[in-house]
Amino acid sequence: MVASAGLLQTSLIWVAYAVAVALVFFVAVITVFTWQTPYDRSKLVTTVAIVSLTALLATVFLLPVDIALVSSTASASRGTKKDWATPERIHGILKTLKIVYYSLYSFDALLCLVVIPFAYFWYEEHDEVLEEEGRETWSTRFWQALKYTIAFIILVIILFLVGFFVPTAAQDHGRHLDLDYFKRLLTNNNGEKALSFGLGLLMTLGVLLYVLYTATGLALLPVSLIKSAPAISAPELSAMTAAELEHNRELQRQIEMRNAGRIVAMSQKDRRELDLLLREERTLVRRQRLAAEASGEGQSTIMRIWTKTQAVFRPLKLFGGILLLCLSVILWISMLITAIDKAANSVCKSHCGYILGHINVFQPVNWVFVKAAKAFPIDYILMAFLILFLFSSSITGIASVGIRFLWVRVFQLKKGRTAPQALLIATVMQALIILAINYAVVNLLAPQYAMYGTQTFCQALSLDPGAPPDCRNHRDMIRPCSESLTDPLAKDVCTPTVMSTFLNRIVLNWTVFGAIDFWAQFAFLTVFLLVFVTSLIRTPRLNLTEIDEEAQADEEEGLLASTSRRFGATWQDITGRAKRTVGGHPNGQGYGTSGTNGTASSR
């Protein structure tokens, strides 16, 4: 009966994980289809991006499962292991977790190092002209993409071989590489060291991206929701554009009347002025059409109702932005508290990656998770929300900063405008960032919760030799396992999570990674603070130039059909006819989209 109770509890945890993975799949689908361009899609790129994001999120969502499983083996109220949690059962749980972790990380590595590069080169090798001429076939395109992918894999293998041989280089100076040497490497567990080197290197690269993109997005995402209402409503934009268009055409009539009846040609000054007015007129005509569509003209009743519903519920968006803003500040404070605590109180400092035995200062995020873990799956839901928030912040950061090489912007991410190459590169960047998010959650945001969950141990001495301590009458002697670093009574009760053990192994084996990852958190906090203060001070402005450029891009792509487009507006959009329209390219920066090279309306 006791054993079946333990099996039921662990099974429910895995069922909750399966449900989370199913939801993650829908999140990945929505993310990919929201950001990719609709007129330049590749089925292979779309599929690879969706599968990759699902696998990456499934990997990071395994952390709360890890925490819940090790927590389920102990009784927090008694400070002892549960009756069903025998060493064999605990070993089986940890072994299952390790298998799932290694499987997911191996699959992630396969996607990021093989599948995504192949999809990238496959798309790059496509040439419509050669295809029409019959000089490009599926096989030639496949082999070209495979050739570049193999070259990329060779570089990666060289890097991992370095990680395999370096661990024992200091102990084996001057020895030749023979079969005994390989055997010694394997028996000394250096294969796992090589794996920890590879993951540590990728995690460190991810931390660098995490500092730039996640910190930026964490500051901008809540502020963008709060400031989502534009500086001008759709009716105001329509009226302003109509007035400018009428003034433009009046100036054209004046020039034409001034030159009417003249035998000689129009002067160069008048010709230049007229050409300038004609170009401006085309821009205003496009903008007027956008404003009309934004006001709901020509749209179905359902779309008009949907637009007004958005306007009515806009205060909820504002309220959600304020809540996320508070959450961002709390996360920042919690990370700062833990980082300072580690820097000041870690016994081994940089020699062990600033591992801390227990938290010395109250840390709000860790406290919330420890309390919520007593009522599973509340902590799982909170952790899922936290991960999705950091994930969304990373996307916002990548969209704001762009994909850059040094200071040169290579690709720009925009909703509905992201090229397939940018989508794949952003997916790899997210993979690296997710590794960094794992590190931040385990080591800074919720170190006690992520390492031991709700496990506690009893400090009371047992009266019977060999019997477990009994704290039923001594509740004051029950301590959290985060304080078990030097207590011998905790070794039989406190089971660390698989993820925390693996991350600690990385920073212990490769202290340089631990030092970089830790001090990079202060850079993260600094970047967040700078972007946060700047975004609060800077007021959003209506960028008509960007609107016109996006409208021109849409029209050149032939996207003239009216689909809904978000026009955040104010109360005038409720009383007027605010509309989401044009080209299916939502954009949170104001009005816009559609059109270019549209012909001027007849005068």
Curated annotation (Swiss-Prot):
GO biological process, one term: protein localization to vacuole
Region (Disordered): 578-603
Alphabetically ordered keywords of this record: Cobalamin, Cobalt, Glycoprotein, Lysosome, Membrane, Transmembrane, Transmembrane helix, Transport
UniProt keyword Transmembrane helix, yes or no: yes
Any one GO molecular-function label of the UniProt entry: cobalamin binding
Stored Pfam families: LMBR1
Topology in the lipid bilayer: Multi-pass membrane protein
Keyword field contains Transmembrane: yes
Segments passing through the bilayer: 13-33, 50-70, 99-119, 150-170, 201-221, 318-338, 353-373, 381-401, 422-442, 512-532
Its job: Probable lysosomal cobalamin transporter. Required to export cobalamin from lysosomes allowing its conversion to cofactors.
UniProt name for this protein: Probable lysosomal cobalamin transporter
